[in-house]
Amino acid sequence: MNAEFSRTLSLLRQEKGVSQRAAAGALGISQALLSHYENGIREPGLPFVVRACDYYGVSADFLLGRT
């Protein structure tokens, strides 16, 4: 992943107006893991990317910074 993914993931959550804890619960991960994704510490697998796209209503290309 790249820095654009982390930034976009964080911005989408903020635009939705939810906390990391709430978003993490909806996405089936811990708040700490979501924080790591948003800060570029860890890289998610494909299942998380798909869930995040569904949750935020965006395409994978958008989430991954390809558009």
Where do the protein language model's features map onto the residues?
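Short alpha-helical DNA-recognition segment
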Residues: G17-N39
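Alpha-helical residues within the helix-turn-helix
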Residues: Q14, G25, D54
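A short, Lys/Arg-rich alpha-helix, primarily the initiator
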Residues: M1-E15
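DNA major-groove recognition helix of helix-turn-helix
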Residues: E38, F48, T67
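Residues that mark the N-terminal boundary/hinge immediately upstream of a DNA-recognition element
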Residues: T8, S19, G45-F48, S59
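DNA major-groove recognition helix of helix-turn-helix/homeodomain DNA-binding modules
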Residues: G28, P47-F62
